[in-house]
Curated annotation (Swiss-Prot):
Residues 9-242 form the PABS domain. The gene is speE. Homodimer or homotetramer. Spermidine binds at residues 67, 91. This is Polyamine aminopropyltransferase. Its EC number is 2.5.1.16. One of its GO terms (molecular function) is spermidine synthase activity. It comes from Synechococcus sp. (strain CC9311). Disulfide bonds: none annotated.
Length: 287
């Protein structure tokens, strides 16, 4: 289990199953919203960062490892990208990356906790960048689970889930009913993607998620990458589609438009990241 961030001297630590992950720095904000405990820190190594209920979420100088991995395999492969849904993502990083594509005409972001948005805009403005003022961006402070349940069939070209760990307000982002609705509201030729935890620190959660998403969508595969401040540093994102594993192949014109401005993602990186699945994970997924 993960416990509250612990400060010892100048260190802010996240504890998880006998292991701790820490950054040297200082706490800027510590408050409890109606949904969760929110901590904003200023670290020496990664700049300002955000924790929710004691879990590291993002930081200025390493957030691209996460946001680029979630967004670009989906946006570079979906048949169309005019209408995008982001569930969660209150720091703005996922929306920022999506809005780099001129083909995105309308982006809905549904974040349950308005204080995450407020504090991210105040303390972490570089992560959201200009997304907050983009006319294509539409923010709703509300329940993303309910939004997915109430949305029309085949309404979105891309659905991205940028949620926290499966506890507290994000717990419902990991179950059959939610993923079924995400599948239902995805257009033909669309791509779904979600962060799917660490195959080391959250091994069973990761395996169960990939299996369930594959069952519901028909095609799903995990992509593996590195997020330095997350438990074990080894993280995953799972991509799914209903017609074919289209997320494995990028559309070259879209890729060329965003690759130069990306710090982590490239078509070559993506190909390698999909192919780094460890044998023990592949065996368990195929059981």
């Amino acid at each position: 289990m993960t416990t509250a961030p612990e400060t010892s001297g100048n260190w802010i630590d996240e504890h998880h199953n006998g292991v701790r992950y820490g950054l040297e720095g200082r706490v800027l904000v510590e408050e409890t919203s109606p949904f969760q405990r929110i901590t904003v820190i200023d670290s020496q190594r990664y700049g300002k960062g955000l924790l929710l209920d004691g879990c590291w979420m993002t930081a200025e100088h390493q957030e691209r490892h996460y946001h680029e991995a979630l967004v670009h395999p989906a946006l570079c492969s979906a048949k169309a990208i005019e209408r995008v849904l982001v569930i969660g993502g209150g720091d703005g990083g996922t929306a920022r990356e999506c809005l780099r594509y001129p083909g995105v005409k309308h982006l809905d972001m549904v974040e349950i906790d308005g204080r995450v948005v407020d504090l991210s805009q105040e303390h972490l403005p570089s992560i959201g960048g200009g997304c907050w003022h983009d006319p294509r961006f539409h923010l709703t402070i509300g329940d993303g689970i309910a939004w997915a349940a109430e949305a029309e069939n085949a309404f979105y070209d891309v659905v991205l889930v940028d949620g926290s760990d499966p506890t507290g307000p994000a717990e419902g982002l990991f179950n059959r009913a939610f993923f079924s609705n995400c599948c239902r509201i995805l257009k033909p030729g669309g791509v779904f993607a979600t962060q799917s935890e660490s195959p080391e620190a959250f091994r069973q959660v990761h395996i169960d998620m990939v299996k369930l998403i594959r069952e519901l969508f028909g095609h799903a595969d995990p992509l593996y990458g590195w997020v330095p401040m997350y438990p074990s540093g080894w993280w995953s994102w799972t991509f799914a589609a209903k017609d074919a594993p289209r997320y494995l192949t990028v559309q070259s014109e879209r890729a060329a438009a965003v690759a130069e401005g990306s710090a982590i993602w490239s078509p070559r990186w993506q190909q390698g990241a999909f192919n780094t699945i460890p044998a023990f994970i592949e065996r368990e997924l195929n059981q």
